[in-house]
Amino acid sequence: MSIFRFFTRQQASAPQARERLQVLLAHERASYGGQSDLVAVLREEILAVIAKHIKVDREKVSVKMDRGDQVSTLEVDIELPLTAKKGRAA
């Protein structure tokens, strides 16, 4: 060990610790609280896109997200009316 190395300033570990904490917090949010927020946002966006083309009762739409070890699935169930009115002429 060199005497010069002893007096030099060590690299700050704060940026690394901050980055690790952010990754940990993002993971925790995704596995607990973030899922319901994401599903709510996806539901509203999906309804907005579908409403451009056909009239759908908002109460007859369900969106569910399941997370597994390897795969996450998003299930969307929409009850369409028998006479779907087209929004645009083809």
UniProtKB/Swiss-Prot annotation:
The keyword Cell cycle applies. This is Cell division topological specificity factor. InterPro entries: MinE (IPR005527), MinE_sf (IPR036707). Disulfide bonds: none annotated. Pfam families: MinE. Belongs to the MinE family. The gene is minE. Keywords: Cell cycle, Cell division. Prevents the cell division inhibition by proteins MinC and MinD at internal division sites while permitting inhibition at polar sites. This ensures cell division at the proper site by restricting the formation of a division septum at the midpoint of the long axis of the cell. The keyword Ion transport does not apply. GO terms for biological process: cell division; regulation of division septum assembly.
